Amino acid sequence: MPMTLGYWNTRGLTHSIRLLLEYTDSSYEEKRYVMGDAPNFDRSQWLSEKFNLGLDFPNLPYLIDGSHKVTQSNAILRYLGRKHNLCGETEEERIRVDTLENQVMDTRIQLMIVCCSPDFEKQKPEFLKAIPEKMKLYSEFLGKRPWFAGDKVTYVDFLAYDILDQYRMFEPKCLDAFPNLRDFLARFEGLKKISAYMKSSRFLPRPVFTKIAQWGTD
């Protein structure tokens, strides 16, 4: 029986999950909820089901895999990572995985806050100034490794790809000074399953955010 992934009809918090499901050749189907337009941003499609799915903490995204029902995007990624042995093999690798998972969430939230702010245009210049330092930290953490934990792909590579690609969309030149990050993105996109998925009709790179945001809604 295929797994069910539920989320808005956007990239949002599920891009890395979708990529990981494809990479692991998992059998899954999506329930994509549509949000209404301004000013009400009607969420009735989701709210009508929210408390009827048996979720401990009803939220989007959710993953239902038989008797396992998981919410919170990183919990879903960890679940899939454990299922497919993509959580790191040594203690050093697992530390790197845990560290990067949380760092990506910080970096994601920072972008979400500015993009969803009514003062987006005022805040954008200052935010752009801070991007090089953020990318420098990722570049130094990756170093000469092919993947962020080491020599093998782990689930945090899917998170890292997602956030670096989002920042690249937001500021196309932000990775120009970091060839190892550009190489990482190209290496990831070159993975056989990922490349095939990106060419398919299932691939959803945009919109990045729901309609309440000031950027990334097209």
Curated annotation (Swiss-Prot):
* CDD domains reported in the protein's UniProt record: GST_C_Mu, GST_N_Mu
Q: What does this protein do?
A: Conjugation of reduced glutathione to a wide number of exogenous and endogenous hydrophobic electrophiles.
Provide the assembly information. Homodimer.
What keywords is this UniProt entry annotated with? Cytoplasm, Isopeptide bond, Transferase, Ubl conjugation
What organism does this protein naturally occur in?
Answer: Mus musculus
InterPro entries on file: Glutathione-S-Trfase_C-like (IPR010987), Glutathione-S-Trfase_C_sf (IPR036282), Glutathione_S-Trfase_N (IPR004045), GST_C (IPR004046), GST_mu (IPR003081), GST_superfamily (IPR050213), Thioredoxin-like_sf (IPR036249)
- Please provide one cellular component term from the Gene Ontology annotations of this protein: cytoplasm
Enzyme Commission number, as recorded? 2.5.1.18
The reaction(s) catalysed by this protein are: RX + glutathione = an S-substituted glutathione + a halide anion + H(+)
Where does the protein principally reside? cytoplasm
GO biological processes? cellular response to xenobiotic stimulus; response to bacterium
Name a Pfam family for this protein. GST_N
Reading the lineage from the top rank, the first entry is: Eukaryota
- Gene3D superfamilies from the UniProt entry: 1.20.1050.10, Glutaredoxin
By what name is this protein known?
Glutathione S-transferase Mu 3
Glycyl lysine isopeptide (Lys-Gly) (interchain with G-Cter in SUMO2) cross-link, renumbered residues: 50, 69
